[in-house]
């Protein structure tokens, strides 16, 4: 039996990422060279963010097609980061397939890893109003003896933490990993790993955790039970939050949908896309990066009466199956080439699990404290009521980049 490399992609808490790339040039030229390097990293990060959005839309369409009537929630950034890190260990057709599937093929490999390094460094924030953490942990069996260069690059580019794990005792290894994840998430995610394939010698865990409060919070005293209309002429009662305020809002005639931005603190925005009656599939088909860019041009500041369902949902997907939709499969097979991790071992990715969890309430996402007030101009408000299936993006203006992407067909369902 060939040893397998387990890959688990989780959404959780990680320590603050710090810049780890060290200059190898003289102090006199440091400023000029660092400015050039910084510019190149920003350009690479910007292109990667665009490709991450494209990946997210592709996966959302595929998952929606194969999982009709089901809530979908994922982090394209989390998935891309993990597989970009695996590019450090992949070669030949296995590497080419990842680059093709994830839209990395036109980017030099050095720019690819430096671009993700920049994204991780720039997006990681920890303040009273916002906590955003991204990172990776490698659980490695001593039998593997991985290449030092792979470990160093994983640390330098992806701030990867390395933890020795005895995969010969699968029960103990499972407990160690689950305890680690539980600790990092302050008990929010428990027993995430349900089983580990025999023969596993390494497991990679990618994390992204987001907790923020709204720039202007909803008043929980006005939240009330209202109807949310499902796709098949039925409805469920959901706690509907309400607020009147100034928001960026627009309408797309081509895709028959309303676009509403509700800002969090610190340049993070929740973007709600509400299709007209019977237009959800039409909207899904039209999802692409250029569509998102066009939406931005349609927005204007208006006084809006907003009604949004409170929700708490989890999206769990088998990436081995999901990524086959975009042509990525060799890394999971016996003939996959991961010899840059360990040249004398035949490795494959045995497990690939993506789990994303979202809690959205009156205070924000994952809860926070504080209040906010807003003075409104005297104008007739536009009414936007999110009371039927919709799409949701959580978006950072800083890179800019889509952090999370979802299709919500039932706020209280699975």
Swiss-Prot record:
<dbReference type="GO" id="GO:0008610">
    <property type="term" value="P:lipid biosynthetic process"/>
</dbReference>
<keyword id="KW-0732">Signal</keyword>
<protein>
    <recommendedName>
        <fullName>Serpin A12</fullName>
    </recommendedName>
</protein>
<feature type="glycosylation site" description="N-linked (GlcNAc...) (complex) asparagine">
    <location>
        <position position="221"/>
    </location>
</feature>
<dbReference type="GO" id="GO:0090181">
    <property type="term" value="P:regulation of cholesterol metabolic process"/>
</dbReference>
<dbReference type="GO" id="GO:0005615">
    <property type="term" value="C:extracellular space"/>
</dbReference>
<comment type="subunit">
    <text>Forms a stable complex with KLK7.</text>
</comment>
<feature type="signal peptide">
    <location>
        <begin position="1"/>
        <end position="20"/>
    </location>
</feature>
<keyword id="KW-0722">Serine protease inhibitor</keyword>
<dbReference type="GO" id="GO:0140678">
    <property type="term" value="F:molecular function inhibitor activity"/>
</dbReference>
<dbReference type="GO" id="GO:0045721">
    <property type="term" value="P:negative regulation of gluconeogenesis"/>
</dbReference>
<dbReference type="GO" id="GO:0006094">
    <property type="term" value="P:gluconeogenesis"/>
</dbReference>
<keyword id="KW-0964">Secreted</keyword>
<dbReference type="GO" id="GO:0004867">
    <property type="term" value="F:serine-type endopeptidase inhibitor activity"/>
</dbReference>
<feature type="glycosylation site" description="N-linked (GlcNAc...) (complex) asparagine">
    <location>
        <position position="233"/>
    </location>
</feature>
<keyword id="KW-0325">Glycoprotein</keyword>
<feature type="glycosylation site" description="N-linked (GlcNAc...) (high mannose) asparagine">
    <location>
        <position position="267"/>
    </location>
</feature>
<dbReference type="GO" id="GO:0005886">
    <property type="term" value="C:plasma membrane"/>
</dbReference>
<dbReference type="Pfam" id="PF00079">
    <property type="entry name" value="Serpin"/>
</dbReference>
<dbReference type="GO" id="GO:0051897">
    <property type="term" value="P:positive regulation of phosphatidylinositol 3-kinase/protein kinase B signal transduction"/>
</dbReference>
<dbReference type="GO" id="GO:0090207">
    <property type="term" value="P:regulation of triglyceride metabolic process"/>
</dbReference>
<dbReference type="InterPro" id="IPR042185">
    <property type="entry name" value="Serpin_sf_2"/>
</dbReference>
<dbReference type="InterPro" id="IPR023796">
    <property type="entry name" value="Serpin_dom"/>
</dbReference>
<dbReference type="InterPro" id="IPR036186">
    <property type="entry name" value="Serpin_sf"/>
</dbReference>
<dbReference type="InterPro" id="IPR000215">
    <property type="entry name" value="Serpin_fam"/>
</dbReference>
<dbReference type="InterPro" id="IPR042178">
    <property type="entry name" value="Serpin_sf_1"/>
</dbReference>
<dbReference type="GO" id="GO:0043491">
    <property type="term" value="P:phosphatidylinositol 3-kinase/protein kinase B signal transduction"/>
</dbReference>
<feature type="region of interest" description="Reactive center loop">
    <location>
        <begin position="364"/>
        <end position="382"/>
    </location>
</feature>
<dbReference type="GO" id="GO:0046628">
    <property type="term" value="P:positive regulation of insulin receptor signaling pathway"/>
</dbReference>
<comment type="similarity">
    <text>Belongs to the serpin family.</text>
</comment>
<dbReference type="GO" id="GO:0051055">
    <property type="term" value="P:negative regulation of lipid biosynthetic process"/>
</dbReference>
<feature type="site" description="Cleavage">
    <location>
        <begin position="378"/>
        <end position="379"/>
    </location>
</feature>
<keyword id="KW-0646">Protease inhibitor</keyword>
<comment type="function">
    <text>Adipokine that modulates insulin action by specifically inhibiting its target protease KLK7 in white adipose tissues.</text>
</comment>
């Amino acid at each position: 039996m060939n040893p397998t490399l387990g890959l688990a992609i989780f959404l959780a808490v990680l320590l603050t990422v710090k810049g780890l790339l060290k200059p190898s040039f003289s102090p006199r030229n440091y400023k000029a060279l660092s400015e050039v390097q910084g510019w190149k990293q920003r350009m690479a990060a910007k292109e990667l963010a665009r490709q991450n959005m494209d990946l997210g839309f592709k996966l959302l369409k595929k998952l929606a097609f194969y999982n009709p009537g089901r809530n979908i929630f994922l982090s394209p950034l989390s998935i891309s980061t993990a597989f970009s890190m695996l590019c450090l260990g992949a070669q030949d057709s296995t590497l080419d397939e990842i680059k093709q599937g994830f839209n990395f093929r036109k980017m030099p490999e050095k720019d690819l890893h430096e671009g993700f390094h920049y994204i991780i460094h720039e997006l990681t924030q920890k303040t009273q109003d916002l906590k955003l953490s991204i990172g990776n942990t490698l659980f490695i069996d001593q039998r593997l003896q991985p290449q030092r260069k792979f470990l160093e690059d994983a640390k330098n580019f992806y701030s990867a933490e390395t933890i020795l794990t005895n995969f010969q005792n699968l029960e103990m290894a499972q407990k160690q990993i689950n305890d680690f994840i539980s600790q990092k998430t302050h008990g929010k995610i428990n027993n995430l790993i349900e089983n580990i394939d025999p023969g596993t010698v390494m497991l990679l865990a990618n994390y992204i955790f987001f907790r923020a409060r709204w720039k202007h919070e909803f008043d929980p005293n006005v939240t009330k039970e209202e109807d949310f209309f499902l796709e098949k002429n039925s409805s469920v009662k959901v706690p509907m939050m309400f607020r009147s305020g100034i928001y960026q809002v627009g309408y797309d005639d081509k895709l028959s949908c309303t676009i509403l931005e509700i800002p969090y603190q610190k340049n993070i925005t929740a973007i709600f896309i509400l299709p007209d009656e019977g237009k959800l599939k039409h909207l899904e088909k039209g999802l692409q990066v250029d569509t998102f860019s066009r939406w931005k041009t349609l927005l204007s500041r208006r006084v809006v009466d907003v009604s949004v369902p409170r929700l708490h949902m989890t999206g769990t997907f088998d990436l081995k199956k999901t990524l086959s939709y975009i042509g990525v499969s060799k890394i999971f097979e016996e003939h996959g080439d991961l010899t840059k991790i360990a040249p004398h071992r035949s490795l494959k990715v045995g497990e690939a699990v993506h789990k994303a969890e979202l809690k959205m309430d009156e205070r924000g996402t994952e809860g926070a404290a504080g209040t906010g007030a807003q003075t409104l101009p005297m104008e007739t408000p536009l009414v936007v009521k999110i009371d039927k299936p919709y799409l949701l993006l959580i978006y950072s203006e800083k890179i800019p980049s889509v952090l999370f992407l979802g299709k919500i067909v039932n706020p209280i369902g699975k």
